[in-house]
Amino acid sequence: MSTPDNRSVNFFSLFRRGQHYSKTWPLEKRLAPVFVENRVIKMTCYAIRFMPPIAVFTLCWQIALGGQLGPAVATALFALSLPMQGLWWLGKRSVTPLPPAILNWFYDVRGKLQESGQVLAPVEGKPDYQALADTLKRAFKQLDKTFLDDL
């Protein structure tokens, strides 16, 4: 579920973790007031889709109109960095340990899943947001929506 030592994460593995976290996190409207992940994931997916063409267009447009190459490249690099910033943030968030209030709720949701007959892997170390995302995804598939009433 989570890595035993969340602090020793490679810089480039954060992008991979961020992509995995964005695919794991359930994009439910009832989670949006509590967790910022819904907005960050939507904006990151938007940036992954539209920023590369915008960067190419900006670069070609400034060069075609006789602009300088330096600002054109800087603008293109900034546009290309936006999706990477979103994935990096999601990767950092996925390995962040849960705060105490959310940790109690995490264990409540796990308890409800186990009461419904689901077999869950034991939690190793202190649970992080990736463990929460895995648990919430499974809870939305297996349980009714009333498990969110305690949130």
Curated annotation (Swiss-Prot):
Report how it sits in the membrane: Multi-pass membrane protein
Pfam families xref list: DUF412
Instruction: State which residue ranges cross the membrane.
Output: 46-65, 69-91
One Gene Ontology CC term in the entry: plasma membrane
Q: Where in the cell is it found?
A: Cell inner membrane
List each coiled-coil range.
Answer: none
Q: What is its main location?
A: membrane
Give UniProt keywords alphabetically: Cell inner membrane, Cell membrane, Membrane, Transmembrane, Transmembrane helix
Q: Which positions form S-S bridges?
A: none
Recorded hits in InterPro entries, A to Z, give: UPF0208
Domain of life the protein comes from: Bacteria
Q: Which family does it belong to?
A: Belongs to the UPF0208 family.
How is this protein named in the record?
UPF0208 membrane protein YfbV
